[in-house]
From Swiss-Prot:
Protein family according to the UniProt entry: Belongs to the tachykinin family.
Keywords carried by this UniProt record: Amidation, Neuropeptide, Secreted
GO process terms (BP): neuropeptide signaling pathway
Protein name: Des[Ser(1)Pro(2)] scyliorhinin-2
Stated role: Tachykinins are active peptides which excite neurons, evoke behavioral responses, are potent vasodilators and secretagogues, and contract (directly or indirectly) many smooth muscles.
Major localization listed first in the record, in broad terms: secreted
Signal peptide: none
UniProt cross-references to InterPro entries, sorted A to Z: Tachy_Neuro_lke_CS (IPR013055)
GO CC terms: extracellular region
Subcellular location per the Swiss-Prot or TrEMBL entry: Secreted
Species the sequence originates in: Torpedo marmorata
Modified residue annotations for Methionine amide: 16
Length: 16
């Protein structure tokens, strides 16, 4: 998981 975002779909959306 990325330390810049919490685990979850929101994290993936932020990376896109």
């Amino acid at each position: 998981s990325n330390s810049k975002c919490p685990d979850g779909p929101d994290c993936f959306v932020g990376l896109m």
